[in-house]
């Protein structure tokens, strides 16, 4: 991290906006931050849905401890913002006994919901 009074230069910055609503931008700073994104306009699949943007991008930076971080993401109207990165926490593995129970339950036929 730079001291608060130090100016960080922009090494490169590009932006393209197209008449169809699509776009692309990227930048890189003097302290190693990089980011990019591409957006595409999509038509809704139903008549009552409007158009929406699907965005894909990434950013990377070096943390205060010197660790390099990188995040890739996609954002749309169905799933929202979905980031991925090797440094994100992951859930612990399912214990074997629970996994066996889940596997067994998956083999059973479904039963209808009881009516009130």
UniProtKB/Swiss-Prot annotation:
Top-rank taxon, per record: Eukaryota
Boundaries of every Chitin-binding type R&R domain copy: 20-92
Keyword 4Fe-4S attached: no
List of glycosylated residues: 90, 107, 110-111
Keywords: Amidation, Cuticle, Glycoprotein, Pyrrolidone carboxylic acid
Cellular compartments per GO CC: chitin-based extracellular matrix
InterPro entries assigned to the protein according to its UniProt record, in alphabetical order: CHIT_BIND_RR_consensus, Cuticle_Struct_Prot, Insect_cuticle
Protein role: Component of the abdominal endocuticle.
Protein name as catalogued: Endocuticle structural glycoprotein SgAbd-4
Organism per entry: Schistocerca gregaria (Desert locust)
């Amino acid at each position: 991290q730079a001291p608060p009074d130090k100016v960080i230069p922009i090494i490169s910055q590009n932006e393209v906006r197209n008449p169809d609503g699509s776009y692309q931008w990227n930048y890189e700073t003097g302290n190693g931050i990089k980011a990019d994104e591409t957006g595409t306009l999509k038509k809704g699949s139903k008549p009552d849905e409007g158009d929406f943007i699907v965005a894909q991008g990434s950013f990377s930076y070096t943390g205060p401890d010197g660790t390099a971080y990188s995040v890739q993401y996609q954002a749309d109207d169905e799933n929202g913002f979905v980031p991925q990165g090797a440094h994100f926490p992951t859930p612990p593995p399912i214990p074997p006994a629970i996994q066996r129970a889940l596997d067994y339950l998956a083999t059973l036929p479904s039963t209808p919901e009881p009516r009130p």
